[in-house]
Amino acid sequence: MATTEKPVLSKYRDRMDKAVAALKEEFGSLRTGRASASLLDQIHVDAYGSSMPLTQVAAVSVPEPRMITVNVWDRGMVVSVEKAIRQSDLGLNPVVDGQTLRIPIPPLTEERRKDLAKIAGRYAEQQRVAVRNIRRDANEDLRKAQKDNVISQDEEKRMETEVQKMTDEAIKRIDEALKTKEQEIMQV
């Protein structure tokens, strides 16, 4: 039943790839010693009675390696944007200058670097668990397909082995991304 093999496995490979991509996106929001516009991507602002991403109420730019500027489009939103940035767990202190907020990026202390490395480790572990859950779902579907006589027992075992290889590959990519991010965080 080679016709069912490819779509089934590619569906789970796609889900595992999305887990790795989600981790890299989460890592983008972790602060390192340098300014990055993606640092503020996870911040939501209370605007017009609802919570909106910062990028929908302001333009974020990086004019210098250790400075982020946020140009708020609506003057009435400046206080809300400042509050959202201060309340984020990024440890940033914006300076208001009219409709612009200047956010100096202070160098990270050794303690803060270690905390960020732990947070990165937690993010990576969450995605490892997600990949393992995807593997579990794939194996359950394969067992069900074998039970329903859609695939043979030999095909089920072969495909389970392939799912395990995909899982190992995804976890390896997660571990590599974590190692890279930890090195980036710990760099002075």
Curated annotation (Swiss-Prot):
UniProt entry keywords in alphabetical sequence: Cytoplasm, Protein biosynthesis
Signal peptide residues on this chain, from the entry's feature table: none
Superkingdom field: Bacteria
Pfam families in UniProt: RRF
Molecular function GO labels: ribosomal large subunit binding
Coiled-coil spans in chain: none
Keyword Membrane: no
Any one Gene Ontology BP term: cytoplasmic translational termination
InterPro entries per the UniProt record, alphabetical: Ribosome_recyc_fac, Ribosome_recyc_fac_dom, RRF_sf
Disulfide bonds: none
PANTHER family: MITOCHONDRIAL RIBOSOME RECYCLING FACTOR PSEUDO 1 (PTHR20982:SF3), RIBOSOME RECYCLING FACTOR (PTHR20982)
HAMAP family: RRF
Function field: Responsible for the release of ribosomes from messenger RNA at the termination of protein biosynthesis. May increase the efficiency of translation by recycling ribosomes from one round of translation to another.
Recorded family membership: Belongs to the RRF family.
Name of the featured protein: Ribosome-recycling factor
Source organism of the structure: Phenylobacterium zucineum (strain HLK1)
